[in-house]
Amino acid sequence: MAKYALLRERVALELPQVQTQEAPAASDGELALAHSPAYIHAVTSGQLPAAAMREIGFPWSAQMVERSRRSAGATVAAARAALGLQAGADARPAGVAANMAGGTHHASAEQGSGFCVFNDAAVAARLMQAEWGRLHGPQRAALQVAVIDLDVHQGNGTASIFRQDASVFTLSLHGKHNFPFRKEAGDLDMDLPDGCTDTPYLQALDEALFELDRRFAPGLVIYLAGADPFEGDRLGRLALSFEGLKARDQRVFEWAWQRRVPLAFAMAGGYGVNIDDTVQVQMNTYELALAYWRRWQQSQHWQNQEMSLNPKPQHPT
């Protein structure tokens, strides 16, 4: 999509400190942590029924499969970088890292929906839990993951995948009357009315983060930083301003920072009447992320942990 190309161009031009890399493609084995083997095979072999393809929203092609694998793989790479689980002797937790696309939260274990084929947040959460366990063994607590989904649409696929999984907490603020019209119950869902503006939105977010803090202690946050709550979005039906969305991101990044919880984020939805507005919302998120990445690099937190990692600086992915 054009917005992704525009975002890459602006990040390269205006935020040269941000290091980017090609998104790796998630393997069948990695995808199978969140999706059934039968569904993966049907997608990759082009054998999904016509009704299933209509639910996804675009036609099958080999390029679609590759793009979907890489969308999931990019969130995996961001989560690895945030936690410091990437390969190499220079692996150090970045604290904050990103996927310039992703946020495919309508995909469930058995089907895609709403332009989402594979659920990148779910794949990344499960894979990071597995890799964390292999690295640290029984001497460290299992990795708990919070998915903070602030796309305007409820993350129904994510909620369904983790319905019986107490190690992953799903939090979603979304439009009550927006897609999907049949919501899935997550761990914490907050419905917002059409036309919701900055002040009530931020009050709801404060309440949600307070409740998350009360009920769960994550070792990783996966944040879906949707641009579609913006007042100029064609599909969002909410009315947040640029400043309101900056304040939203600030709250999430600060919440994670105060608890020294690494955070990986994906850009998720954004369908502005003016595409430049969508990209500006996303750029604002990147600028804030860079500021928090700097805090992580200046912090002595990771140097005080008993981790078999050799610290060297990394930039957001």
Give residue spans per PLM region.
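A general "terminal functional-core" signal
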Residues: 50-317
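Short, conserved beta-strand segments within well-ordered enzyme catalytic domains
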Residues: 21, 32, 99
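A general structural signal for well-ordered alpha-helical segments in protein cores
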Residues: 4, 40, 72-75
